[in-house]
């Protein structure tokens, strides 16, 4: 964000809406309500940005970002990284994209290695047409409304916790 309080062109192009440390803490605490973080093979923050989630996650968390100016320990495009572990936690605030297209790509890319995907996403992920676009073996465990001012813009957002399971969930018929 520049001195006038508006987003820079770089932030807009990379869809950088940084999570506050307070929101990140609330999100991590919600995950910890359901899971022991030490039981995951790996923990990935796929779009680390300024590192708000890292303050509240174990030191072994792998922080990924495409922007070299961010607090990552792995510089690169999350969507081009291959993951091998099967019981991983993916947590963070990925870019959304038009009609959440990038957010869906992040979810789909994480899924083969994920046990849990916990992302800040637009409130539209509560709607049947968005839920039905998610892989059917991904089940919502919990959520937290994190709507508010993000980099000078009011955004309707929710922190969703999804768990990958063997059983398929039913599609929602409207």
Tell what function each PLM region has:
Residues 1-174:
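Class I S-adenosyl-L-methionine-dependent methyltransferase catalytic core
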